[in-house]
Amino acid sequence: MSLLTEVETYVLSIVPSGPLKAEIAQRLEDVFAGKNTDLEALMEWLKTRPILSPLTKGILGFVFTLTVPSERGLQRRRFVQNALNGNGDPNNMDRAVKLYRKLKREITFHGAKEVALSYSTGALASCMGLIYNRMGTVTTEVAFGLVCATCEQIADSQHRSHRQMVTTTNPLIRHENRMVLASTTAKAMEQMAGSSEQAAEAMEVASQARQMVQAMRTIGTHPSSSAGLKNDLLENLQAYQKRMGVQMQRFK
């Protein structure tokens, strides 16, 4: 796996699924392929994206700045600086300085990532802030190692919390989760159906599913009533795709 592929993988792992994730993936691919060279416009676009947490925006801004060639005097962006200040905690800053000194001795991506993984997310963000604010310099490879270590920690905690939700025995949470999944699957079906003539059927199924979820939420239903909702939807989607000659197993 190439270095940039690895960076893209880690960075995208902390971006919530949805149309915005696909957009960010495209931007990252363009940047890494040298197709997008307007850092100013890229940062302006990133700043105004909804849904993303300030830290995720900060990490993406840091990656764009590392990758896109820019004039030396280009202003640093406040939204990135604020996200990478380790919540203003002096302990984070102290640890970030110690980590920075260690990173100065590293020359490889994997070496830097290993060193960084033993620090807290706050210290890692502060260390990125040091480099972003030009208070310290490391090679691009080492900076990417720092980025990936930070993303790995964030993705780990997201995964833990996701697993807790999936394995919860609380029927109300499970019920709501099934309805949310059915709703997002319906949305994906509508997007995939696009404008082809045969799409009307898939759109109809998706629309009915969304109306059903809306009705269930409005009148309040028994927690077990949503069981199988998402799977029914997926079976419909796959039947539609078979007729279209498309095989897609990705939603399972």
Curated annotation (Swiss-Prot):
Q: Which GO terms describe its biological process?
A: viral budding from plasma membrane
Q: Cite the residue spans of the region called Membrane-binding.
A: 1-164
Keywords of this entry: Host nucleus, Membrane, RNA-binding, Viral matrix protein, Virion
- Write down any Gene Ontology CC term: virion membrane
Q: Where is this region: RNP-binding?
A: 165-252
Q: Per the annotation, which location comes first and is thus the protein's main one?
A: virion
Single GO molecular-function term? structural constituent of virion
Q: Which Pfam families match?
A: Flu_M1, Flu_M1_C
Motif Nuclear localization signal located where? 101-105
Give the UniProt subcellular location, in the record's own words: Virion membrane; Host nucleus
The annotated topology with respect to the bilayer is:
Peripheral membrane protein
The record's comment on protein family reads: Belongs to the influenza viruses Matrix protein M1 family.
HAMAP family recorded for this chain? INFV_M1 (MF_04068)
Indicate the quaternary assembly: Homodimer and homomultimer. Interacts with NEP. Binds ribonucleocapsid by both interacting with genomic RNA and NP protein. May interact with HA and NA. Cannot bind NP without genomic RNA.
Known function? Plays critical roles in virus replication, from virus entry and uncoating to assembly and budding of the virus particle. M1 binding to ribonucleocapsids (RNPs) in nucleus seems to inhibit viral transcription. Interaction of viral NEP with M1-RNP is thought to promote nuclear export of the complex, which is targeted to the virion assembly site at the apical plasma membrane in polarized epithelial cells. Interactions with NA and HA may bring M1, a non-raft-associated protein, into lipid rafts. Forms a continuous shell on the inner side of the lipid bilayer in virion, where it binds the RNP. Determines the virion's shape: spherical or filamentous. Clinical isolates of influenza are characterized by the presence of significant proportion of filamentous virions, whereas after multiple passage on eggs or cell culture, virions have only spherical morphology. Filamentous virions are thought to be important to infect neighboring cells, and spherical virions more suited to spread through aerosol between hosts organisms.
Remarks, miscellaneous:
Most abundant protein in virion. When expressed alone can form virus-like particles in transfected cells.
Q: What is this protein called?
A: Matrix protein 1
Q: Upper lineage ranks? A: Viruses, Riboviria, Orthornavirae, Negarnaviricota, Polyploviricotina
Gene it is expressed from:
M
